[in-house]
């Protein structure tokens, strides 16, 4: 299996892909848009994309989900353990500047504050590790993955420096073809969809009433403006259950009556860590 990810080798996206899909070929992309493009053009390619973090919230890929409408095959709740990486021989007392992605810096803010370290934002965690490795400067460090330390020959100066020791990022596996697991009443599933409402009073209230009447549990609802306007919005919605469950079917049929556009993005097994 080929899996594309945003960033450079050593990123958390690549780490998650390798841990969940043993033997997969990982391919680095400069942007999230490039990930979506590659997966849209080749059914043998999957994209692994960070969707949200338990501590710092949404990553910001929702517009690309709307734009490309790839199918979601799986979700993975991946433990993010941040590590302070320095050049060989450096000690924490030597460090002045720390480089990483804005979210990694935010998620490790207490460690940075307690050690009087200066946070410097860069595009990604693995890129920060590569930068520190290239400088060979003992006063610089990066916050990145264990994989990054191996790739860029850096020492792990301190492990698990994140504020929340149960720091999790939700990754989505997406691809071109439609696939969904067979319905089993003993399994937990998530149905993901996007929709655009008709322009009428109380449209959202009316559209969502079907979920309440049928006893279906909404677990996510986000709104995003349609391109070039603030008067029309798309909604990204996730429902607890399989689309073949009658109460989910009835809820979506009711929703469709109030929509100009509705598209199911995928049905997939709920990650075992979702309830933790």
For each feature predicted by the language model, list its residue ranges.
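Domain-level signature for soluble enzymes in the chorismate/prephenate branch of the shikimate pathway
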Residues: 1-276
């Amino acid at each position: 299996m080929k899996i594309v990810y945003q960033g450079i080798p050593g990123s958390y996206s690549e780490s998650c892909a390798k841990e969940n899909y043993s033997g997969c070929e990982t391919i680095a992309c400069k942007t999230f848009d490039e990930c979506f493009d590659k997966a849209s053009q080749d059914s043998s390619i999957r994209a692994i994309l960070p969707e949200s973090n338990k501590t710092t919230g949404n990553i910001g890929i929702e517009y690309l989900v709307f734009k490309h409408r790839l199918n979601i095959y799986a979700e993975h709740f991946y433990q993010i353990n941040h590590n302070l990486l320095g050049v060989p021989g450096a000690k924490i007392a030597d460090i002045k500047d720390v480089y990483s992605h804005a979210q990694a810096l935010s998620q490790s803010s207490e460690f940075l504050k307690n050690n009087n370290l200066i946070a410097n934002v860069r595009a990604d965690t693995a890129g920060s590790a590569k930068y520190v490795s290239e400088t060979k400067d003992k006063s610089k460090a990066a916050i990145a993955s264990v994989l990054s330390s191996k790739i860029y020959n850096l020492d792990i100066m301190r492990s698990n420096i994140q504020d929340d020791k149960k720091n999790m990022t939700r990754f989505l596996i997406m691809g071109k073809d439609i696939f969904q697991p067979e319905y089993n009443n003993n399994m937990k599933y998530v149905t993901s969809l996007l929709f655009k409402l008709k322009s009428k009073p109380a449209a959202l209230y009316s559209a969502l009433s079907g979920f309440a009447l049928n006893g279906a549990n909404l677990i996510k609802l986000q709104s995003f403006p349609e391109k070039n306007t603030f008067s029309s919005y798309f909604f990204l919605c996730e429902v607890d259950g399989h689309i073949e469950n009658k109460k989910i079917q009835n809820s979506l049929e009711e929703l469709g009556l109030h929509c100009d556009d509705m598209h199911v993005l995928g049905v997939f097994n709920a990650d075992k860590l979702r309830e933790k």
